[in-house]
Structures are given as structure tokens and as C-alpha cells.
UniProtKB/Swiss-Prot annotation:
Represses the expression of the murPQ operon involved in the uptake and degradation of N-acetylmuramic acid (MurNAc). Binds to two adjacent inverted repeats within the operator region. MurNAc 6-phosphate, the substrate of MurQ, is the specific inducer that weakens binding of MurR to the operator. Keywords: Carbohydrate metabolism, DNA-binding, Repressor, Transcription, Transcription regulation. Residues 1-77 form the HTH rpiR-type domain. Residues 128-266 form the SIS domain. Signal peptide: none annotated. It comes from Shigella flexneri. InterPro entries: Homeodomain-like_sf, HTH_RpiR, RpiR-like, RpiR-like_SIS, SIS_dom, SIS_dom_sf, Tscrpt_reg_HTH_MurR, WH-like_DNA-bd_sf. The gene is murR. This is HTH-type transcriptional regulator MurR. PANTHER family: GLUCOKINASE (PTHR30514), HTH-TYPE TRANSCRIPTIONAL REGULATOR MURR (PTHR30514:SF17).
Amino acid sequence: MLYLTKIRNAESEFTGNEQKIADFLRARVSELKSVSSRQMAKQLGISQSSIVKFAQKLGAQGFTELRMALIGEYSASREKTNATALHVHSSITSDDSLEVIARKLNREKEMALEQTCALFDYARLQKIIEVISKAPFIQITGLGGSALVGRDLSFKLMKIGYRVACEADTHVQATVSQALKKGDVQIAISYSGSKKEIVLCAEAARKQGATVIAITSLADSPLRRLAHFTLDTVSGETEWRSSSMSTRTAQNSVTDLLFVGLVQHQ
């Protein structure tokens, strides 16, 4: 379930007590084998029920399930670190050889793919495929690296017969958004979900009655709140200088899966 990733990406939604619990779990994950919910509640000055509710909010049945899962994740992470310490212990530096850089990049992309697939909602994807398959027109929006992902998806969709607009110019994106109609679909790609231009386009699309599908991170964001559907991507973007590469890898895996699903649906 990758609960450590869930905790990191849901931080902006935590209450004060939930943040205390999250900080404790991350700082003391190596000691969780000997920690009970009662001990934890006493140490943090909160109720046991708050800890149970926190675990359930993350998708676990209770604290015991969350604790055991975190212990397992920590152990697996330690094993990977010991086996591949050369390319996962730090970001790329100016002293790295090309071989080391290649290993770091590959590992980063592997982690982005593993985490994205592990947290993916495939039932939601099926609903999205059904919505897109009926759309008379599709607009794809994105900036920077996300725009490249959008352009790639637009070419794929056009090849199988969909009417698609994917413009790099933000003014054109805004104009197209304002011309969408009910039944049309806008696919907004933004890892942060907070790019002003993309959010404005999503607002315009919703106002026109179009369905907004966001390909974004798990973190709460204006785009995530605006979207009718979300396709979640995960990458260690705050930990690596090459973060946009892992983000793009995660986004491409989602758009490729969406494309293949649409091909099957035809």
C-alpha cells in the first residue's frame, strides 16, 4: 500500500493531531515494532481513537495494520538501500560518473513507476475511459514537461480517431477551454496541480459543462478540487534535482495506460 508515500502526499490535508502522528511515524518508523497505540497516544498527548482514525484515513483497518505495513515498507527500503546504495542515497552531483548518473536516473524512474502503479485506482480509470470514448472533442492542457506528455497523448489519440487539441500557447489553451461544450473532455496534466494557467483552463472547462480529468499528484491542489476525475501520479519530486524526469515518467505511464485502455474499448 506504500503508506509512507500516502502520508507524504496527504500532508496538506492533515489536522494538527494528524500531523503529529505523521511526524512520529516517519521519525520513529524503525522503532514501531515496540510501540503500541496507547504508548504513542500518551507520548503525543492525543487520544488512541485519533490514531485509529488516522490509520483508517490512510486506508488501513486500524493502527496495527498500519504499523505492520510501515515496518514492512521500512525493511524493504533498507534492503534496497543496502543493495543499491550507490544510486539511491543522494541526488545526482557534479562528481558523478555517467554510469552512476544512469543508475540513479533508472532507479528514480523505477520508483516513480512502482509507486504510481501501486496507488492507482483502476476502477476509476475504467470510468474515465468510458467518458473519453464518448467525447466529441478532447482538449489536453499542460505546461513544460507536462505539455510534452500531453502532446504525446494527443498524437496517440488522433491516430485512433479522436478529435484532439493540444496547444503549447497558454492563451490558445484558454481560448479552447472557453469553447468547450457539454460532453467534451479536458485532460489537464500538472504534477503540482497549482499552475495558474492550467487551473484557469479547468475552471473555464467546468463552466462550459465539459468533464475535467486531471493527471496530477496525490496532494491536495486547486486542480484536484476542480477535476471530475483524477489519475494519480507519484514521484520523488522534492528529493531529486532530476525530479521532472521521474514525474514525466510517471505521467507517461498513466497516459500510455489510458491510451491502451481506449484502444481496447473501441
